[in-house]
From Swiss-Prot:
Domain of life: Bacteria
Membrane-spanning intervals of the chain: none
Name of this protein: NADPH-dependent 7-cyano-7-deazaguanine reductase
Organism: Brucella canis (strain ATCC 23365 / NCTC 10854 / RM-666)
Keywords linked to the UniProt accession: Cytoplasm, NADP, Oxidoreductase, Queuosine biosynthesis
Length: 155
C-alpha cells in the first residue's frame, strides 16, 4: 500500500492514543471522502455516552445518534470515539454537550447536512432529549429515523 494515501495525515488511527482530558483538548481528524459527489448518509451511534452534571459532578448518560451527509470530508472514527470519551470528566448540561458535539463536527467536516439527537437518561426524574441540525435534510438522500424510543422507565 502506498505511503501517500488519504489516510497518511492521520495521527491517532493505528497507534496508542490516550483519552483526552477535555473536549477542548480532543483532536478530531478527517479524511477525504472517496465518494465525494455521491449523496449518502453516514450514521454514528454512541449508546453509552457519558458526561458529568456541572452542578453535582454526578454522571449523566445519553444515547447519541449522529447523522451527516458528507461533502469533501469524513470524520475518522477513532478520533470521534476519543472526542466523545473526553466528555466523561467534563461538566456541562445536556444541551451544551449535544450542541457542542454537533458544532465541532460541522466546523471540521463542512458537511452537506448534519443532525445529532441526544437522548439523555433521566436525572431528577426527567429525561431530556436534545436535537441539533444544520438545516433541512437533503431530498435526494435516504435518511432513516433515529429509532430511539421515548423514555418509558419501567412502564
Amino acid at each position: 500500500m502506498s505511503e501517500n494515501t488519504i489516510y497518511s495525515g492521520l495521527k491517532q488511527l493505528g497507534s496508542h492514543t490516550d483519552i483526552p482530558l477535555t473536549p477542548e483538548e480532543a483532536v478530531l481528524e478527517r479524511v477525504a471522502n472517496p465518494q465525494e459527489g455521491t449523496p449518502y448518509c453516514v450514521r454514528f451511534t454512541a449508546p453509552e455516552f457519558t458526561s458529568l452534571c456541572p452542578m453535582t459532578g454526578q454522571p449523566d448518560f445519553a444515547h447519541l445518534v449522529i447523522d451527516y451527509v458528507p461533502g469533501k470530508w469524513l470524520v475518522e472514527s477513532k478520533s470521534l470515539k476519543l472526542f466523545l470519551f473526553s466528555f466523561r470528566n467534563h461538566g456541562a448540561f445536556h444541551e451544551d454537550c449535544t450542541v457542542t458535539i454537533g458544532k465541532r463536527l460541522v466546523d471540521l467536516l463542512e458537511p452537506e447536512w448534519l443532525r445529532i439527537g441526544g437522548y439523555w437518561y433521566p436525572r431528577g426524574g426527567i429525561p431530556i432529549d436534545v436535537f441539533y441540525q444544520t438545516g433541512a435534510a437533503p431530498l435526494n438522500v435516504w435518511i432513516p429515523e433515529q429509532g430511539v424510543a421515548n423514555y418509558r422507565g419501567r412502564g
